[in-house]
């Protein structure tokens, strides 16, 4: 339940706006419920039309417009990237390395200049491949954290 938990913590730590995205409708719904249980929303589920009639995005609009969740796959649905926008100070991906690697190719589309891309949930066997993908896509690695077999990278777009 990465996006939901991370966005709740970010909001509680002072982020003025957070947006979570997931390809699993249940994860999006539970993220919205978790945000509500933490006092971050007015439990309203909306639907936003996608690029075609068969492709809708479920959106949880939160109280204060400070927290939201989209059902989308940013890797295979370029139209969802337009909806999510490009003005984020931090982009976080807590998911498998096999998703982080292609995500590193498009992460900058969401980021302000100087923003950070934090990737975590990376098993040691894939850590070097993620590092290489970040560097190949123009990121500067500013921090590496290892906890047992798991890695996290904090990177800034050059």
Regions found by a protein language model. Name each.
Residues 1-73:
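Conserved SAM/SAH cofactor-binding pocket of Class I
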Residues 20, 92, 119:
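Conserved SAM-binding loop
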Residues 76-90:
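A short acidic, Gly/Pro-enriched loop at the edge of an enzyme's catalytic core
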Residues 89-102:
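A short SAM/SAH-binding and catalytic strip from SAM-dependent methyltransferases
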Residues 101-116, 131:
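A short glycine-rich, Lys/Arg-flanked "PGG" loop and its adjoining helix->strand segment in the class I
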Residues 114-127:
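ADP-ribose/adenylate-binding Rossmann-like module
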Residues 139-158:
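Core SAM-dependent methyltransferase catalytic element
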């Amino acid at each position: 339940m990465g996006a939901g938990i991370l966005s709740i913590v970010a909001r509680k730590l002072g982020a003025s706006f957070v947006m979570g995205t997931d390809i699993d409708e249940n994860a999006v719904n539970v993220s919205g419920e978790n945000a509500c249980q933490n006092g971050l929303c007015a439990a309203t589920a909306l639907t936003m039309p996608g690029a075609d009639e068969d492709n809708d995005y479920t959106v949880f609009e939160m109280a204060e417009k400070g927290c939201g969740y989209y059902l989308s796959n940013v890797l295979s649905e370029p139209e969802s990237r337009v909806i999510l926008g490009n003005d984020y100070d931090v982009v976080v991906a807590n998911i498998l390395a096999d998703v982080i690697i292609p995500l590193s190719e498009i992460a900058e589309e969401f980021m302000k200049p100087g923003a950070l891309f934090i990737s975590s949930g990376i098993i040691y066997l894939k850590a070097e491949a993620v590092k290489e993908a970040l560097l190949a896509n123009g990121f500067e690695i500013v921090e590496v954290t290892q906890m047992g077999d798991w890695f996290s990278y904090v990177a800034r777009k050059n």
